[in-house]
A protein has these predicted regions:
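Redox- and metal-dependent alpha/beta enzyme cores, enriched for Fe-S-associated oxidoreductases
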Residues: 3-30, 43-48
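Flexible inter-domain linker/hinge segments
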Residues: 100-152
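C-terminal non-catalytic interaction/assembly regions of soluble proteins
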Residues: 26, 32-102
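Active-site cofactor/cluster-binding pocket
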Residues: 42-46, 58, 62-73, 149-159, ...
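Flexible, glycine/charged-enriched surface loops at secondary-structure junctions
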Residues: 1, 32-33, 88-93, 119-129, ...
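Short helix-loop-beta junction
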Residues: 20-34, 85, 173-179
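Extended, charge-rich low-complexity interaction segments
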Residues: 61-80, 116-133, 216, 304
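Glycine-rich phosphate/diphosphate-binding loops that line cofactor/substrate pockets in enzymes
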Residues: 1-2, 27, 50-58, 144-150
Length: 320
C-alpha cells in the first residue's frame, strides 16, 4: 500500500509468499507493505529511499541466514545504515526465516506483521520453534490465500511405488495441454525406497505465488498406502467440500473398522467427497502386477476433472 505503516524488507525465497500475504491483508483494509531487494550489491541507497513511504512506522528485515556474534544479519545491517544515511529514525526489527529449510507460510508472515503492531520482538525467528533461546514468535491459523481458480492437491505415497513419477507426469500434462499455470513440490524421507513421499501440486488460471507446501485447504488429497491412515493426520488437510481418494484393499465393513472416529467425523463435518480404489487388485486383473501408479493417476484425472479423462489417458500413454 502507498500509505503502508508496517513494511517487511526481504530478498530471496520468501518474497512471493510475502507479496501474496500483503495483497491479502491490504484487501482487508490493513496498511502493510513489502519492499523486495532484487539486487543486493551494490546496495542502492537512492532507490531504497525512494521506495520507502513516509508513512511507515515500523520495518522488519527478514534474512535467511544466522550470523552468531554479529549485531545483526547482513540485510538488516544495510537497512539500518541506509536509514541513518537518509536521516530517518524509523524503528527496525530483525527476523530470520527459512532456517533448516523450513517453509514460510502466509500465517508466519501475518505473525511478523502482528509482531510489528504489538510486542515488537527483535532478532526473532519465524517458521521454526526456538525452545532454547525463545526467539520465535507465535504463529496463528493458516489462511487460505489461493485464487478461486487455483486447485491444490497432495498425494501421500510410498517410496518407489511410482507416485512421484506419476505426479511429475500429471503436472507436465496439465502444464503442456491446458492454459493453466502449474507448480509441483516433492518431499522424500531419508529411506527413499520404502519411505514416505508427499507430492504437492497446484494449478490455476493465474500465476501461482504460493512457494510453500500444501498443508491445509487442499482441494484434492490422495492416500496411496492404507497404513498411513493410522499413522498420519491426512484428512484434516482437505478443505470443506474437497475430495479424498484412498487406495486400499479393505471391504466397506473393514473400512468402517479401520477408519478412526476422528477421521469419519472430519469427513462428515467438512462434506468431503470420499472415494476408495483397490489399485493393486485392478493392476493384477489387467496385467500390471503391483504397478499402481498409472491406475491412481487415471483416478486423479477422473476425480479432479481438470481435463477430459479420455484426453488425459491419451497423454499418459504418450508419456510412457
Amino acid at each position: 500500500a502507498p500509505d503502508a505503516e508496517h513494511i517487511i524488507i526481504a530478498m530471496g525465497s520468501v518474497c512471493d509468499t510475502i507479496a501474496e500475504t500483503v495483497d491479502y491483508l491490504n484487501a482487508k483494509g490493513e496498511k502493510v507493505g513489502f519492499l523486495q531487494v532484487h539486487l543486493y550489491r551494490p546496495f542502492s541507497l537512492a532507490h531504497f529511499a525512494a521506495a520507502l513511504p513516509e508513512t511507515v512506522k515500523v520495518l522488519t528485515v527478514l534474512d535467511r541466514t544466522k550470523e552468531p556474534g554479529a549485531l545483526g544479519e547482513p540485510l538488516y545491517g544495510d537497512v539500518c545504515s541506509a536509514l541513518i544515511e537518509t536521516g530517518r529514525t524509523t524503528k527496525v526489527l530483525a527476523g530470520r526465516y527459512g532456517l533448516s529449510s523450513k517453509d514460510v507460510t502466509p500465517a508466519q508472515i501475518i505473525a511478523v506483521f502482528d509482531n510489528m503492531k504489538g510486542a515488537q520482538k527483535n532478532h526473532f525467528t519465524v517458521g521454526i520453534i526456538d525452545d532454547i533461546s525463545n526467539s520465535s514468535i507465535e504463529v496463528g491459523a493458516e489462511p487460505d490465500l489461493a485464487d478461486a481458480s487455483t486447485v491444490s492437491c497432495k498425494f501421500w505415497g510410498l517410496g518407489s511405488d511410482g507416485t512421484v513419477g506419476a505426479n511429475k507426469n500429471s503436472i507436465k500434462i496439465i502444464g503442456d495441454h491446458t492454459d493453466k499455470y502449474a507448480q509441483a513440490y516433492f518431499e522424500y524421507d531419508t529411506k527413499k525406497s520404502g519411505g514416505i513421499t508427499r507430492s504437492h501440486l497446484r494449478f490455476g488460471d493465474k500465476p501461482i505465488r504460493s512457494s510453500y507446501l500444501v498443508t491445509k485447504n487442499a482441494n484434492f488429497v490422495a492416500c496411496h498406502n492404507q497404513s498411513y491412515m493410522e499413522k498420519y493426520d491426512i484428512v484434516s488437510e482437505i478443505k470443506p467440500g474437497g475430495t479424498f481418494l484412498l487406495n486400499c484393499t479393505w471391504t466397506p465393513e473393514e473400512l468402517d473398522h479401520h477408519l478412526s472416529a476422528e477421521v469419519k467425523r472430519t469427513i462428515a463435518n467438512n462434506n468431503i467427497h470420499f472415494y476408495t480404489i483397490d489399485a493393486i487388485k485392478i493392476g493384477k486383473e489387467i496385467g500390471l502386477g503391483n504397478k499402481t501408479n498409472a491406475i491412481l493417476q487415471s483416478a486423479f484425472f477422473k476425480l479432479a476433472n481438470i481435463i477430459p479423462v479420455d484426453d488425459a489417458v491419451t497423454y499418459m500413454k504418450a508419456a510412457i
